[in-house]
């Protein structure tokens, strides 16, 4: 009897940080993709920044959220990791239990990479979670007027047009490198997904790690950018979708993105609570002529999810499109059953 053939799971690497990454990862987990998440380590605000300063550990917040998005634990157990101490706890105020656990395990293991792998095993993570680098990074911004600032949490507050960002090591001026596992995942992927997330403070901090950025440029995988729905205060005022892509290409010195996903569903002006989501400005405008000059393929559709007075990418719709792309690009080979 002949062996039947089946299509293997697509190997998808998702690179970013912030709140956008978990939305896509949950969808990929539900579709049973072979997923690897590469998470930014340049955050220096909130609980992550405080622990980074006091305990000298890689910022934990984005890593925590990514681990939870791929975890098979019950929601009750996930809530424990997300619990934040209230303001009455003084020193612990604002810290989540998950961040404290990550900091403690990094100290115990002597390595943030090893700590994440152990925690992923404990949490039943379905996939791989890697920090973009195995050390905390400092994000620097150079603005159009030539002024500079360092620190991820400070960049948007300057409220000037950003010309360029780059990263340096927290301790000294040694060259920042990604781990071997990150580079192998990128080179072995069927698809590399960038975003969604803050352009200058969630996506580019990863790509500005020299060997990581070069791996994304060199990979034979389909490189997909998920364009943001809204512009962001202090980062992308007045940006069109093609402006987002142009910035990525200029930073890496090459047009490396193969496909851009763009939401075309209208966001009503009175829907978004701009007090609750104070980083939002207006919906990203479309420039399809500009996009066609930047990338070979643009996919525009309704990828919108209205929730809690805010607008988000619908993870299920986005992932359906990613899977269609993965199989249509002929990068998924047949494997024996």
What do the predicted segments below correspond to?
Residues 2-14, 29, 33-37, 124, ...:
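Non-transmembrane, aqueous-exposed alpha-helical and coiled segments at domain scale
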Residues 2-58:
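Gly/lys/ser-thr-rich phosphate-binding loops in alpha/beta enzymes
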Residues 20-25, 201-208:
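Short glycine/serine/threonine-rich phosphate/pyrophosphate-binding segments
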Residues 32-33, 219-223, 257, 295-296:
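A short helix->loop->beta-strand "cap" motif at the edges of active sites that frequently abuts
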Residues 42-161, 321-322, 328:
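Electropositive, gly/pro-rich neighborhoods at or near active sites that engage anionic ligands
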Residues 135-200:
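Active-site gating loop/helix substructures
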Residues 206-213, 239-244:
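Charged helix-capping and loop-helix junction motifs
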Residues 238-337:
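C-terminal functional extensions of proteins
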